């Protein structure tokens, strides 16, 4: 089974100009490293246009586009982005096209309704994860929305964004009621405990070590560390060593590694007491270096590096597990 365990869909705001500016901020480091934008100052509009990131070229990613860009995938996990205020705008997952049939104007407070509509469009392909922000309307409202998203909308998991929304993952007053509800509902929780190049994100709130309190308190809650904690990868891996209910997915990290480095990374997991069954493939699609096919092929081709570095190949069954079977087992989807 081939599963993208981390992807996004639709838009982030009803204002298309803001959506482009947000995308530009996130991609600035990538374009600078490629030499397509100046490294020492902010680009001009003309330089953005020349780089290929034109305002008019920002695409809407709907179910059809996601399916098109994931050929051969059995499942695509689509993650909601819960509402928050940024630069005076309310942002979060919205359907600016109206193609999904959710009533009313685009509204980030309907983020889970939009993701549920994506799943209904192709229930055999898409797996929806809800999102809530306990700092937005308080933990009681977040808990109620999570219950609605799972019991009424049928979403299969929860994605949280502490560093972007400026709350700590181990905040007992804000976050623990959400974890308790997720545990009661029997759903996995994926948490962005990793870095971000966005100026407004708080790096101190992205450290994977903040999840240790969750592992100590909620031993029956499945916790997935997004992006394998990059840049704190070793910290994330040690949490997988310590807590039997912790997992990690590879999006973002896999895009920064060469195929050889990815092979070496997989080889060092088990000597560090991290079973490869705890690792999931993900892409963070539709980000700019996050082509699902290229990243899938990078992972499936790692054993071509074995002879070069004089190490044994990663067993095919373990690669198949990372590619999808591990995640399928956690969600009860069944493997192939």
PLM region spans:
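A structural motif corresponding to the C-terminal end of an alpha-helix
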Residues: 66-76, 115-126, 185, 214-222, ...
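Catalytic pocket-lining loop regions of alpha/beta-barrel enzymes
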Residues: 153-157, 164-281, 289
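Histidine-centered divalent metal-coordination motifs
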Residues: 6-12, 192, 227
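Alpha-helical scaffolding within the catalytic cores
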Residues: 59-65, 110-115, 142-145, 208-211, ...
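Active-site gating/metal-coordination segments in enzymes
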Residues: 83-197, 201-205
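Divalent metal-dependent hydrolysis catalytic cores, especially in the metallo-beta-lactamase
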Residues: 28-60, 64-93, 97-98, 125-133, ...
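Mid-to-C-terminal alpha-helical segments outside catalytic/metal-binding sites
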Residues: 1-5, 12-69, 144, 148, ...
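Conserved, mostly hydrophobic/aromatic
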Residues: 6, 115, 149, 158, ...
